Amino acid sequence: MIFDKDNFQEYDKELWDAIHAEEERQEHNIELIASENVVSKAVMKAQGTLLTNKYAEGYPGKRYYGGTEWVDVVENLAIERAKTLFGAKFANVQAHSGSQANAAAYMALIESGDTVLGMDLAAGGHLTHGSPVNFSGKTYNFVGYSVDKETEMLDYEAILEQAKEVKPKLIVAGASAYSRIIDFKKFREIADEVGAYLMVDMAHIAGLVATGLHPSPVAYADVTTSTTHKTLRGPRGGLILTNDEGLAKKINSAVFPGLQGGPLEHVIAAKAVSFKEALDPAFTDYAKQVVANTAAMANVFAEDNRFRLISGGTDNHVFLVEVTGVIESGKAAQNLLDEVNITLNKNSIPFETLSPFKTSGIRIGCAAITSRGMGVEESQQIAQLIIKALVNHDNSSILEEVRQEVRTITDRFPLYENL
């Protein structure tokens, strides 16, 4: 007999209370962490189905277990929708995360110890792009490229010269904290000139790529990886795309059996839902609003000389602000804003002088507030509230004013109706 407790709240009150408290936090906080979003009820419902019961090692039509005819349907739906959404010939939807998608791509493309050119973490890259504390930096010989010191934007000529010098087997393009358009065609040209593979990690911009608001890397990269959350607004998970059949086979083998065992078919179902949502014209409207909101918010900081907007602006869903003109560090800013129910993260800026545990900057993204229905006016208001709080960080009465103004905004834009 199945052990079941219908009344979850009564059966496990301690856990229920923690979940409920998080629900309240999300409801009454302004979420500006660039890697976070608000998924649909359909995505949550798919992820909560009994598909979680099913083991399905292998791939559709080639499983190591029986009873997989319906999870094959689910996974094939996710695969075909991902291919349609991004214009790719092959898709792997089994990677549990973006980091595992990147690990699988590396396994398919290069060998341990090979030289890889990736974006330096302090310049806007990701841990999996060669950080020495990450598996990528421990397994491969990563060399970091940065941004131009004056413009704080990618300098493709400098990257080409660096590539000629280090002769990488692989070049990784993509970022976790870069606010400008990335020219994937130029990266392809650089890779071709030095005889390297090109891998693009589009985790942060996938929703913008899907809607044509950022140039797609799929036609230029040997392999494209992504998460399925962030701007794509799906469940937490990974995705790998390629147009090369030989690489597709290597990628599949790298994911299973190379890195993972059984796929999370309930999460794959949620991915399928989110891909369907992203194919809807309404998602393009959403993505356009994300870009508009981000630009509007960034402009408020650009017009205030107490702050410095990194690279002078933004073309996507994210931007960085140097805050040390008004408060000790990015960490201090993050902690202070937590107190007034505005959530964002400290972030290193290019050519950072403080430790990564303190930082000079903060990172701000608008994907989540846009999902709640907020627009340009609210984005500008939120930027002004951030400035008000940071400038008056030692004034408790003003901080209380900010907290109340935040509550007024969140009350106007409920997280979910009748959750």
UniProtKB/Swiss-Prot annotation:
One of its GO terms (cellular component) is cytosol. Its EC number is 2.1.2.1. Catalyzes the reversible interconversion of serine and glycine with tetrahydrofolate (THF) serving as the one-carbon carrier. This reaction serves as the major source of one-carbon groups required for the biosynthesis of purines, thymidylate, methionine, and other important biomolecules. Also exhibits THF-independent aldolase activity toward beta-hydroxyamino acids, producing glycine and aldehydes, via a retro-aldol mechanism. One of its GO terms (biological process) is glycine biosynthetic process from serine. The modification N6-(pyridoxal phosphate)lysine is found at K230. Keywords: Amino-acid biosynthesis, Cytoplasm, One-carbon metabolism, Pyridoxal phosphate, Transferase. Pfam families: SHMT (PF00464). GO terms for molecular function: glycine hydroxymethyltransferase activity; pyridoxal phosphate binding. Belongs to the SHMT family. It comes from Streptococcus uberis (strain ATCC BAA-854 / 0140J). It is found in: Cytoplasm. Pathway: One-carbon metabolism; tetrahydrofolate interconversion; Amino-acid biosynthesis; glycine biosynthesis; glycine from L-serine: step 1/1. This is Serine hydroxymethyltransferase. (6S)-5,6,7,8-tetrahydrofolate binds at L121, G125, H126, L127, S355, P356, F357. It catalyses: (6R)-5,10-methylene-5,6,7,8-tetrahydrofolate + glycine + H2O = (6S)-5,6,7,8-tetrahydrofolate + L-serine. CDD domains: SHMT. The record marks H229 as: Plays an important role in substrate specificity. Signal peptide: none annotated. It is an enzyme of class 2 (transferase). Its cofactor is pyridoxal 5'-phosphate. HAMAP family: SHMT. Homodimer. It comes from the Bacteria.
